[in-house]
Amino acid sequence: MAEEKKLKLSNTVLPSESMKVVAESMGIAQIQEETCQLLTDEVSYRIKEIAQDALKFMHMGKRQKLTTSDIDYALKLKNVEPLYGFHAQEFIPFRFASGGGRELYFYEEKEVDLSDIINTPLPRVPLDVCLKAHWLSIEGCQPAIPENPPPAPKEQQKAEATEPLKSAKPGQEEDGPLKGKGQGAAAADGKGKEKKAPPLLEGAPFRLKPRSIHELSVEQQLYYKEITEACVGSCEAKRAEALQSIATDPGLYQMLPRFSTFISEGVRVNVVQNNLALLIYLMRMVKALMDNPTLYLEKYVHELIPAVMTCIVSRQLCLRPDVDNHWALRDFAARLVAQICKHFSTTTNNIQSRITKTFTKSWVDEKTPWTTRYGSIAGLAELGHDVIKTLILPRLQQEGERIRSVLDGPVLSNIDRIGADHVQSLLLKHCAPVLAKLRPPPDNQDAYRGEFGSLGPLLCSHVVKARAQAALQAQQVNRTTLTITQPRPTLTLSQAPQPGPRTPGLLKVPGSIALPVQTLVSARAAAPPQPSPPPTKFIVMSSSSSASSTQQVLSLSTSAPGSGSTTTSPVTTTVPSVQPIVKLVSTATTAPPSTAPAGSGSVQKYIVVSLPPTGEGKGGPPSHPSPVPPSSSSPSPLGGSTLCGGKQEAGDSPPPAPGTPKANGSQPTGPGSPQPAL
């Protein structure tokens, strides 16, 4: 084997006769032998070099077979024009034949039988061309039908943008990974038979990112034209509709490259022309694109960030900087940059750190104009309290001296004075809330002046305002409102039947005091029926001027004239501290003759109306009940109780039978009965 290898290595040099043949074909005769030998050595070396480079390309492609494209790449590497026309989609299987002392490699072509071609049946006739209509959109929404493409979800957009090798087209999931060039030939030769080639011959599968061509349909082109014209046009109503469409439409994924290019080019042109209105419109387009939850903008941030940063730190954005409000555009663009950093900044791209360095560099420079200085401070302040604490607060003293030199010094330029005033207002606006959280109260102007220089007194006053505003907001958050809606409760006191007419005592309590419905029954021993006057009823109420709730005892005392005993039925309830007003209503009613015994009497109703105590408004918060244990040894257990009673008034008719009150707790009142009020 070693001898054969040495023999093959010795035969790799071309014979010198080949050089003579080539020279004769070119019209050069009588070439010397030494010249042919030198040419043979040089050509052999060049061929070996090209072959080695072609093998390198083959190994880099992870293939086991050398192709003509590898030879072409090797020739291009040597600055040699490659050979054209020797390309094939598949590997060409050359066959070897020898005879007559010669060796020949040839490509074996397939023999075709004409009878097979003639007898082959004709293919099916294709279908005729037809037109079919379907809805592109219904009231601005694309219907989910097979003819309409589904909108690409945000996850798929992110995967295509960040991991192109893992993303696949809709028809490639079933086919699996892309195949090498040799796999298709192996499958064709197998004719349906499953052949698994060795991995050394096939190579590892690889996937290339397909070239994405952003081709818009006619409808999308028309939509893009209308949207861009409306966003930068003069009609505010159309502009609002266009921005709303950009912020909510889920089918703008294919038009994102156009929109980002439109915004970046528009900012570049209008900054040179100092067109403030168009710059504002373009920034509103950026805001609408970022508000759309279905769009993934990370692939286009490299175009949007320079456009937004230009509107922040540009030296001049309008024709009249002393009159036009370009400060609002800088503030709006600074908020956009902060939103971009919040959504797209990662540890890989470091968007926020790079933007922070840009703002800091332009702010620290002594030659920076006041407009650029304002934009840099606004951009840093919108990035959060940590950036303010780290980068802005340490430079407040230097910036305050620069502002004071412009405001208090000789008037050099009105634009500089206006810019310094805006920078001072911006610093006070953003630094005061941070200082209110960092520094403990109280706030001393001398301490602020010593730490922050000329801005110290103004900062101190703004910090005091920030503390007061924060306390007011906390008080508003902690304030609670309790609304209780309950039906009006009714307390009915009834007694068992006794000799003589008896009437139940009815106590009405307002709906603001939640009293449970309770029924008290006082049983007495039976006595011979005899006419007797109506009993006297007393309601003992306790009132207190304090704000706390108390426990009140309602006692019903009934005394009969013919007996020496008194029955007391206490009812304990917890109500808020109120000052009651007792109203005595005397009512004369007529009962059916079959149920009422002979005799005359009157009904006395005590209506208790609770009012707030003296010094308490109507809108005060309700008091929480704090029950106090009552004493059962006295009808009036609480100090300061008021005994409310009334004189008996004779009625025109006997009272109704006991135990038959109205359903709503009221008794029928005659038209002629007096109603005195206490």
UniProtKB/Swiss-Prot annotation:
- Composition-biased stretches, type Pro residues, lie in 622-632
tRNA-binding keyword on record:
no
Enumerate the GO terms in the molecular function aspect. aryl hydrocarbon receptor binding; DNA binding; protein heterodimerization activity; RNA polymerase II general transcription initiation factor activity
**Extent of Low complexity compositional bias:** 542-574, 633-646
Q: Which GO terms describe its biological process?
A: mRNA transcription by RNA polymerase II; negative regulation of cell cycle; positive regulation of DNA-templated transcription; positive regulation of transcription initiation by RNA polymerase II; regulation of DNA repair; regulation of transcription by RNA polymerase II; RNA polymerase II preinitiation complex assembly
Spell out which residues are annotated as carrying Phosphothreonine: T120, T248, T660
UniProt crosslink position (Glycyl lysine isopeptide (Lys-Gly) (interchain with G-Cter in SUMO2)): K196
Chain segments annotated as coiled-coil in the UniProt record = none
**Gene3D superfamilies tied to this protein:** Histone, subunit A (1.10.20.10), TAF6, C-terminal HEAT repeat domain (1.25.40.770)
Whichever gene encodes this chain, its name is: Taf6
For this UniProt entry, what's an example GO CC term?
Answer: MLL1 complex
Query: From which organism does this entry originate?
Result: Mus musculus
Q: Name the segments for region: Disordered.
A: 142-201, 524-574, 611-678
Q: What is this protein called?
A: Transcription initiation factor TFIID subunit 6
